[in-house]
Amino acid sequence: MNCGKIILLFITIIGVAKSREENCKCGWDNPSRIVNGVETEINEFPMVARLIYPSPGMYCGGTIITPQHIVTAAHCLQKYKRTNYTGIHVVVGEHDYTTDTETNVTKRYTIAEVTIHPNYNSHNNDIAIVKTNERFEYSMKVGPVCLPFNYMTRNLTNETVTALGWGKLRYNGQNSKVLRKVDLHVITREQCETHYGAAIANANLLCTFDVGRDACQNDSGGPILWRSPTTDNLILVGVVNFGRTCADDAPGGNARVTSFMEFIHNATIGETYCKAD
C-alpha cells in the first residue's frame, strides 16, 4: 500500500473542500418545545428533505448539502434509473405531509440529475446525490447541513447521534405523518460485524443501536446527525441504509459520510458548501 498517495489524496480532498467554503450558515436547528417526544418541532431541522414517488406509500429521506443538491441512499433511486426518475420529486421544508397549513416553506422540486455511487450494491456504498432543477430557497426554516470536513478522522463510537424521518412507526406498520427524531448511539465496527459480517460491516458503514429505538422502513436515505461539541452545528455523519427489522436486537446500518466525501465532491462540482463557524 502506498501510504504517500493515500495521505496526498486525503489532503487534496480537504483542500478542495476548504477552497469551496463560504461564511454562510449550516447545520443549525430551531429550538424544540417538545419534551421527551419523538415528533420534531415544525421545521426544527431545516436540512431535512423527502423524496416522494409516483407509487403511493413509498418515501425516502434526504439531506440538503448545497442550494441544489441533497444526499440520500442509492437504493431509493436505483430501480428508477430506467424511467429517468420520472415522477419523483424532492420536498423540503415539510413537517406533516398530509397538510400544508403548519408551515409556509414547504416546496416541491423536480429532479435534474441523479448520481449513484459507481460501486453501489445492496449493502455497500449505498449513497446517491440528487440535483434539482431549481435552487432551494434558503431561510431559517430551510438550509444545508454541515458536512464533516473537520471531522474526517474522528472516532464517533459511543457518541449520540440523531436519526430523522417519516418512516414507519413499527415494522410493517403505518408511516408517520410528521417528521420524527430518535437518538441513537454509534457502536464499534466489531459489534456490527457480529450481526452482519465483515463484508457488510466494513469501514464505510456507520452502525447505530439503542434498545427499542431505530430508524425504520421509509426512513432510508435520511440523515444521521451528530452535534459538534465545539461549534454546536449539526454534522451529517451518516445516511440511513438498512436494518434487520425496526428496533430489534440488531443495529442499523448507515453510509459513513466521511468515507464518501470525494464522491460527494465529484457529484457537486461547481457548488459551494457553507462552513461551520
Swiss-Prot record:
Signal sequence region: 1-19
UniProt GO molecular function: serine-type endopeptidase activity
The keyword Glycoprotein is annotated on this UniProt entry: yes
Disulphide bridges: 60-76, 192-207, 216-246
Domain Peptidase S1 per the UniProt entry, residue ranges: 34-269
Gene Ontology CC entries for this record: extracellular region
GO biological process per UniProt: proteolysis
SMART domains attached to this UniProt entry: Tryp_SPc
Main location: secreted
Domain of life from the UniProt record: Eukaryota
InterPro entries registered for this protein in UniProt: Peptidase_S1_PA, Peptidase_S1_PA_chymotrypsin, Peptidase_S1A, Ser/Thr_Proteases_Immune/Dev, Trypsin_dom, TRYPSIN_HIS
Glycosylation sites: 84, 104, 155, 158, 218, 266
Record's keyword terms, sorted: Allergen, Disulfide bond, Glycoprotein, Hydrolase, Protease, Secreted, Serine protease, Signal
PROSITE patterns: TRYPSIN_DOM, TRYPSIN_HIS
KW Chaperone (keyword) present: no
EC number: 3.4.21.-
Active site residues per record: 75, 126, 220
Uppermost EC category: hydrolase
Tissue specificity as recorded in UniProt: Expressed by the venom duct.
Compartment(s): Secreted
Annotated family: Belongs to the peptidase S1 family.
Protein's UniProt name: Venom serine protease
Organism, as annotated: Polistes dominula (European paper wasp)
